[in-house]
């Protein structure tokens, strides 16, 4: 019986190992790291099978080892499913998600009744069509923008004449300007305007006019386009914010967009958005209707699909040892330097050099601000059904890149988070997401001190 079972495991493992090899090395449709767990597991089974038939004296022990390994992984899968049973098998999870969705829609509808310009902020890049002649790269202008809820309330702010999170009077001021360039952390997602980084700087320093160019979901190519399109007069400095959580991922996606690609490749390319801001506004509002339809349709589809397919999904997940694979890959990744982001890092540096040259030609100074992500400080680094880990290797490479290009660095990880007893206090309810109001102001203080 042992021999028959072991032989069956051997044949199955051999076939699956060949399948993994084909998918990773020949078809190249899967990253090697994603299937590393299966490589190891199937190789172990094959290895112990040969020991089983070669050293009969200890064959029973080899059999027990393999069964113990497979049994341990299976028990872990069952434990994981049990610990998340509310999400998988009960309606309470879906009802919670439904309440979140309905809460946001109710907030939007109430604001819409009071202010017809109300609109839920989104990144227009995600709805870009190949035949689209104009791509908005900021939000709707002079509008009541509604964002997210991480701290117990939905944040909102009034956009300026170009679709940024500023008081419109900023464009009339004759003071020297400092531009804040970045993604949702700069834009001020999930907090109201008085509590974002830009507002904090304005409270602390009346010498400069601080202008917020933050756009959610943007990386450096998008941000370079913002500078080229909306460069104002009398700019002294640029605070360029790098968020380690997703900037390298998003810059690769931006280069796939033909219009952003033109910004990168052609120094003279422009959509003349300052002059065409009304047209940009029209496109943004038209696409917003599609965005609202997708919000509703995706929620209903996802909810119905998950409820009807949970049992089959869980069974397949256990069979594939999905969570065991994620755990092993995560543990191995901490001990291994990975270079899979080298393309993104090189692309980021190429764009950074272009940004630096552009800024210096305008007689301004570029200052690089490093923003850390939640998983850097999360002890377990496991949330949203996946393992996450900040990449210390990328951290070093980014800093080497910035130093090589002679750009001043402000490291918020070192200057703020490492000085806190519990860095997770910077995140609302200590959950993954954006920073809270207090830490946004702490960052404003650090940036202001760098100016003095």
Predicted regions and their residues:
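Membrane-embedded alpha-helical segments of integral membrane proteins
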Residues: 8-51
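Histidine-centered active-site loop/cap adjacent to the catalytic His
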Residues: 1-6, 428-452
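Hydrophobic alpha-helical transmembrane segments in integral membrane proteins
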Residues: 74-94
